[in-house]
Amino acid sequence: MKTLLYAGSLKLVEKSGVGQAIYHQQQALESVGIPVTMDPKEDFDAVHINTIFPNSFLMSKRCRRKGKKIVYYAHSTKEDFRNSFRGSNLLAPLFKWWIKRCYRTADILITPTDYSKKLLQDYGISKTIYALSNGIDLQNYKRSVPAGCRFREAYGFSPEDKVILSVGHYMNRKGIVDFVELAKGLPQYQFIWFGYTPPSARTADVNKAVKTQLPNLHFPGLATQEELKAAYSGSDLFLFLTHEETEGIVLLEALAMKAQTLIRDIPIYKDWFQDGINTYKAAAIEEFQNRIQEILEGKLPSTVEEGYKTVAQRDIPIIGEKLKEIYQKLELL
C-alpha cells in the first residue's frame, strides 16, 4: 500500500505548524514501513489531507469517488481561527461551517489532542475522530551550547543577558500584544519573537504592538529550523503566551530542546501540563511578570527534565506505531 500526503497549497502553510505536521507524518509513516508519495499522479491507497483550502476539499471528494481511504487532519477549529487575522472574528461562523464540510468528506479525522477532539465532537461531526499528536523528531532537536552562543552573538546578547524567546505568527491569539507589554514591564530582560504575518493581515492592536520600539524588544521575522534550534539553545526561557491551540508544535520543540518553559494556563494544557512539574503556568500579565522573574532569578526549580519526559511520549516512532494501528482499523494493512 502507499499513502499520498496531499500537498496542495503547501507554500501557504509550509512555514507554519501545519507544514511541520505534514513533514512529521511522512517521517512517522516511513518509520513503520508505510510508503509515502507527494505526487497525486502516482497510485495510492490512502490520502492524508492537512489543509482546508478549496483544492483540499476537492481532492478529498475526488479520492472518495475513486474509493481511496481519506484521513483528514483536523488542525483547524473555529476557536483557534478567532483572534488571528484581520476580520477573523467576523468570519469565524462561516469558517466553522466550511471546516465541518471539509471534515465530513473523510473516512476518519485525526486531531492533535483530546481537547481539539472534544471541540470537533461538539460541532456535531459524527466521523470517527482520533486524538494523535503531530509528533516531534527528538533526534533532530538536541540542545547545543555552540549554537546557543552563535544565536546570542548574532543578536548582540551578552552571556549575562537573560533572553526570553517566543515563536509564532503576529496575531493576538498567539499573545504577541502581551509579549510587548511584558517587555515594557521587565526592561532588565531581552525579549525576542520569531515569526511573521503580513501587515495587511494583522489586526490594529497587533500592528501597533510590533511597531513598539524598545531596546529590549526584538522582532527579527521568520527563522529557519536551524536558527530556531539555536534560539532554543541560547535563550533562558521559552514563553508561550498563546490563548488557543490544537497542540502547539513550537512548544513541543522547546520541550524537546530542554528549554525552560512558561505557558499560559488555558484549557488545552489543563491536564497535559502540571504547574511546577513539567512547565510553569500563568494567566494574567502580573502573574507572568512574577513568574518570569522567579524563574530567571533562580527562585524556582527547573522543570526541564520532566518537560522532556512529557514530549518524549510524542516522539515520531511512537506516533508512527499509533498511525499503523489506525491504518489497521481502516483495513489498509
Write out the residue ranges for each language-model feature.
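Short hydrophobic beta-strand element within catalytic cores of glycosyltransferases
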Residues: 260-263
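Conserved acidic donor-binding segment of nucleotide-sugar-dependent glycosyltransferases
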Residues: 273-286, 293-300
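Glycosyltransferase donor-sugar binding loop
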Residues: 6, 167, 189-205
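Aromatic "clamp/platform" in nucleotide-sugar-dependent glycosyltransferases that forms part
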Residues: 243
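Membrane-proximal helix-turn-helix segments that form the acceptor-binding/catalytic region
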Residues: 91-109
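Nucleotide-activated donor-binding/catalytic signature segment of Leloir-type glycosyltransferases, i.e.
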Residues: 204-226
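Short alpha-helical donor nucleotide-sugar binding micro-motif in glycosyltransferases
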Residues: 103, 222, 230-235
